Amino acid sequence: MKILSTIILLSTFLISCNSPAQKNKQTPKAEYEVTKTDAEWKAQLSPEAYNVLRHEGTERAFSSPLNDNKQEGTYVCAGCGTPVFESNYKFDSGTGWPSFDRVIEGNVAFSTDNKLGYTRTEEHCATCGGHLGHVFDDGPKETTGKRHCINGVALKFIPENGKTK
């Protein structure tokens, strides 16, 4: 009897883990101002940037030099150069990824991501659709309360003096 109860319980658990709420929500691809073929993106981007920007990958924590960057300037999408974050809104979240408390309005788009079995808000470049990272509600309370947790490889930094880093 214990074995039968265990099998029923396990079966119920496995079926519930495969419910529609656990599946990645498929939304139609948006049309973006900058569009390229997969081959063009591969030729333009490093393998790491291609994985993150075009396949919604995640770089390893603490692997990006931009995480510790303290210079004044603008962070742009590594795919198309659209300005997405300003350095004056960057903060050290301790997570190992560059973090900001706000975006440059109109240049970042948001969607729902359920890939890990729970809902997260995903951030994309509004110009090319490149995956940037995710936004969470555990940022600095004295500002927006948001933490835009961004893959450094999805960004390029333009210092105030205009030279690309």
Residue ranges and their predicted role:
Residues 18-39:
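Sec-dependent signal peptide cleavage junction
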Residues 7, 30-32, 39-40, 87-90:
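Alpha-helical interaction segments
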Residues 25-32, 71-79:
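Short charge-dense sequence patches
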Residues 1-25:
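Bacterial Sec-dependent N-terminal signal peptides
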Residues 42-76, 82-165:
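A short Gly-Trp-Pro
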